[in-house]
């Protein structure tokens, strides 16, 4: 082949590649984002812009999105195009009932750094919530939504052919299939070529860069990213960042050997800047432990004010007179002249409990240093300057001496101790004299070798002590000149450490700050990991959810969802396959924009109302599109409307389907029953008619979209849906609540009673004349104990740290059933006879018992008639026996 022919062939190949590349670049996958998070910072995409996956000009597959202007991260929008080679991992999450679909991209470090450089302020805003794991800030989370009301429009595939653009819409399953089959193959090939260009030899094993996220992994991802789910008024789901907890950082406890329980410890940290003292440590946890233990001021204001009596290990102190007693107060200005300074002995009384007289003050020039045997505590050496007391005589008695110095401990809180403290290393040198005199305007606190400092505010005393020579002057520096500072030495402090200037904190409190448990603290996730949970979404229980189990409180949806999962989890595997537990959002989304009680049969049913329900059906049908719901024997639908819990059980939903190939036998089979359970049972059927009619429309739409001929779960034989075979009923003699706040507990009893009967579950053969009292004769008593039962089940599922957090939260907020039980224990220890064993301190005396009153006396109004009392009235029983049509009765409530 001649050279000219070869050149023509290469030109033709290049032209084909160019056209192919151009055609490939026109192929795009477009997603519509409802929310966009960088880390856990919520921002927005530009108006009208979407998420695009396509090939760039270099024929590399890339992710492209246009970020809108955000005042926190830059006032200008920016178009980002990130090649897949710069992405570590991509996760896809399908819709799970009310939870939307999600696309998560984890950037590698280089692409994240470039993105932060392009967008001013992005790094500071995104990394601020993730001090311990900044890699979480590299997650791009896109909350997806359909392009329109049709749920099958999650992704748009567009391409150009002969200068014409074609656009097709598909559901999320098609988008996921394209990502795993097409995009992943191109992505892996691109990574292999990149490794070959870098001349890396040997076989390369590439791990999967694309994965599907399970519901449990999504719950854990939200917890790691500090995001919380918010249910909007229209039933949609939004996500928001959890507010930063002011008590989130836990202080490192300081050892208290030698302290009694009456002492009060106050720990003050110098701030975040003190972390620079431990920059040589490899672990952040080690840095934090070192800095928190070494840079905290410890104040004592009780009888145990003196530190533990032990000298520095390798430091020989000269003896003065004899071994000092516990009440001996002594000191010296330096090592050479230690014997020339007098000492004073006094009784170590509680100096804070004496009454301080007005105008009492002691000058720091007149204070004597504490004894050396009281210098070391928790590895820190404390020393103060030595100035003799002018108002204390060695001949004074204990009472006189105590009266004279009783103001010292209290007066120490009238100044900022940080202004009078010098910190130096454990092995301080003798040439650094403790009696070094500083000017009164001294504004630095020295650390380590004395060359490093942090800024403080000058000392400003209140008023002079009456017996001292301290002159009364507003300017203490002019009147008194120089004064000395007490000194504090911290061990293991790095030499030459430097801390920035910080303003002096407020006066130290008299008791340590107690860290409270925030209400959003997570307890556990149910069902447990590793269990077979097909069709069961995990539920995260928070501390605030358990508070709804208190007396006279309404159960929230989290506790209800936990119990639904628990009941389903405890069923046998065969029975579980025939049960579908809907979540509490199904009926809310099904009746969105629907007028209240429009199907109550008290007014004509309008076609537009039926159309509203049918339009809402695709939203909830997406949640169960992966399995055949009508093939189940039980469909449990919990409902919360107007702060009231109800439940509807669809028994034998396939009974509404007629097999036309054997119509006679099919119509002779058991029908479909919609059983309505209302613990606030009255004579008015309006709510029952309205809710059950909505469920009938839902079942009809469910058949048309899943079981009709040509659908995904259609039968081989021709079938039709017969609405006449759907019977609305209610069980007889069901328990009725005797208050207006236990409705959720009764609903749990109804759901549990359908499956947990000792002999067998309730089946379709028990209807329509099903008597609940025959199965559960003591149903009312069982419902009254349901609150304690749910609480105990939660404690069983929680581990020990979770139970500890819950108990602490209940003590802080004075709530919880466990607190009520602890208070009732006092009655067990109220025996008349003398005790042989000492009463435990957790048990209170009888007159301190706060047990709640009996249920019969809890009603404020003695004439109050509860729902159960109304249903048990003789006139009510007579009306029910007459079986007068319910539609003729007026509204009872």
From Swiss-Prot:
**Keyword Protease listed:** yes
Q: What is its EC class?
A: hydrolase
Source superkingdom = Eukaryota
One GO cellular-component annotation of the UniProt record comes to: nucleus
- GO terms, biological process: adherens junction maintenance; protein desumoylation; proteolysis; regulation of cell-cell adhesion involved in gastrulation
Q: Does the keyword Cytoplasm apply?
A: yes
- The segment annotated Protease runs over 538-800
The Swiss-Prot or TrEMBL record describes its family as follows: Belongs to the peptidase C48 family.
What is the protein's name according to its record? Answer: Ubiquitin-like protease 2
Q: Which organism is it from?
A: Caenorhabditis elegans
């Amino acid at each position: 082949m001649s050279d000219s022919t070869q050149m023509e062939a290469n030109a033709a190949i290049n032209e084909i590649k160019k056209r192919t590349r151009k055609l490939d670049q026109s192929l795009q996958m477009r997603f519509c984002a409802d929310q966009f998070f960088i880390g856990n910072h919520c921002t927005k995409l530009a108006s009208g812009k979407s998420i695009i996956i396509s090939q760039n000009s270099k024929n590399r597959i890339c992710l492209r999105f246009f970020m809108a202007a955000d005042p926190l991260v830059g006032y200008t929008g920016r178009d980002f195009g990130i090649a897949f080679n710069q992405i570590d991992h991509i996760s896809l999450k399908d819709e799970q009932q009310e939870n939307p679909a999600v696309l998560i991209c984890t950037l590698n470090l280089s692409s994240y750094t470039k993105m932060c450089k392009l967008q001013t302020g992005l790094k500071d805003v995104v990394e601020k919530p993730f001090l311990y794991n900044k890699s979480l800030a590299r997650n791009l989370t896109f909350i997806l939504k359909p392009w329109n009301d049709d749920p099958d429009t999650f992704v748009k595939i567009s391409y150009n052919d002969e200068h014409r653009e074609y656009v097709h819409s598909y559901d999320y399953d098609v988008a996921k299939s394209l990502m795993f089959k097409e995009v992943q193959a191109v992505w892996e090939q691109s990574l292999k070529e990149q490794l070959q260009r870098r001349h890396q030899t040997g076989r390369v094993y590439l791990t999967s860069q694309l994965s599907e996220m399970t519901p449990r992994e999504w719950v854990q991802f939200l917890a790691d990213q500090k995001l919380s789910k918010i249910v909007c008024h229209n039933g949609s789901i939004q996500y928001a960042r959890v507010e930063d907890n002011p008590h989130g950082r836990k202080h490192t406890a300081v050892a208290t050997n030698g302290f009694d329980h009456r002492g009060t410890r106050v720990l003050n940290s110098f701030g975040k800047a003190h972390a620079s003292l431990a920059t040589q440590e490899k672990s952040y946890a080690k840095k934090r432990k070192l800095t928190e233990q070494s840079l905290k001021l410890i104040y004592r204001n009780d009888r145990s004010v003196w530190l533990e009596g032990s000298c520095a290990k390798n430091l020989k102190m000269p003896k003065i007179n004899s071994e000092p007693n516990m009440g001996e107060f002594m000191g010296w200005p330096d090592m050479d002249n230690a014997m020339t300074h007098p000492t004073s002995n006094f009784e170590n009384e509680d100096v804070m409990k004496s009454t301080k007289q007005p105008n009492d003050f002691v000058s720091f020039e007149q204070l004597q240093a504490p004894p050396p045997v009281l210098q070391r505590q928790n590895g820190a050496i404390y020393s103060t300057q030595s100035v003799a007391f002018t108002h204390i005589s060695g001949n004074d008695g204990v009472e006189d001496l105590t009266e004279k110095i009783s103001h010292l401990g209290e007066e120490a809180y009238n100044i900022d101790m940080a202004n009078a403290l010098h910190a130096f290393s454990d092995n301080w040198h003798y040439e650094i004299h403790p009696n070094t005199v500083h000017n009164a305007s001294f504004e630095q606190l020295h650390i380590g070798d004395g060359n490093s400092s942090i800024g403080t505010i000058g000392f400003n005393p209140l008023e002079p002590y009456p017996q001292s020579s301290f002159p009364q002057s507003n300017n203490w520096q002019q009147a008194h000149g120089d004064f000395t500072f007490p000194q504090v030495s911290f061990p293991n402090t790095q030499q030459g450490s430097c801390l920035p200037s910080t303003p002096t904190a407020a006066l130290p409190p008299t008791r340590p700050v107690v860290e409270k448990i925030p209400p959003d603290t997570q307890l556990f996730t149910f069902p447990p990991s590793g269990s077979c949970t097909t069709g069961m979404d995990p539920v995260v229980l928070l501390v605030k959810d358990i508070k709804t189990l208190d007396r006279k409180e309404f159960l929230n949806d989290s506790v209800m969802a936990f119990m639904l999962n628990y009941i389903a989890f405890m069923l046998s595997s065969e029975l579980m396959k025939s049960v579908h537990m809907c979540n509490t959002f199904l009926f809310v989304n099904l009746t969105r924009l629907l007028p209240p009680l429009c199907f109550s049969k008290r007014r004509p049913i309008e076609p537009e109302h039926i159309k509203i329900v049918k339009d809402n059906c695709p939203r909830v049908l997406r949640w169960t599109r992966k399995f055949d719901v009508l093939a189940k024997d039980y469909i449990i639908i919990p409902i919360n409307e107007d702060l009231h819990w109800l439940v509807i059980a669809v028994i034998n939903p396939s009974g509404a389907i007629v097999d036309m190939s054997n119509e006679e036998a099919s119509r002779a089979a058991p029908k479909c029953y919609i059983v309505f359970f209302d613990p606030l049972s009255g004579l008015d059927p309006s709510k029952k008619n309205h809710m059950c009619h909505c469920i009938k429309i839902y079942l009809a739409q469910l058949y048309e979209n899943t079981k009709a001929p040509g659908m995904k779960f259609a039968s081989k034989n021709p079938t039709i849906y017969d609405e006449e075979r759907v019977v609305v009923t209610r069980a007889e003699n069901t328990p009725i609540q005797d208050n207006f706040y236990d409705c959720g507990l009764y609903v749990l009893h109804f759901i549990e009673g359908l499956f947990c009967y000792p002999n067998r579950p309730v089946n379709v053969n028990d209807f329509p004349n099903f008597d609940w009292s025959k199965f559960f004769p003591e149903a009312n008593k069982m419902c009254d104990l349901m609150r304690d039962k749910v609480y105990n089940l939660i404690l069983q599922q929680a581990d020990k740290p979770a139970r500890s957090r819950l108990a602490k939260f209940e003590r802080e907020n004075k709530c919880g059933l466990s607190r009520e039980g602890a208070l009732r224990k006092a009655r067990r220890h109220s025996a008349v006879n003398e005790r042989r064993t000492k009463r435990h301190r957790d048990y209170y005396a009888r007159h301190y018992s706060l047990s709640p009153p009996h249920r019969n006396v809890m009603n404020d109004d003695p004439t109050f008639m509860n729902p159960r009392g109304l249903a048990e009235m003789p006139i009510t029983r007579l009306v029910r026996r007459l079986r007068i049509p319910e539609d003729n009765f007026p509204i009872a409530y």
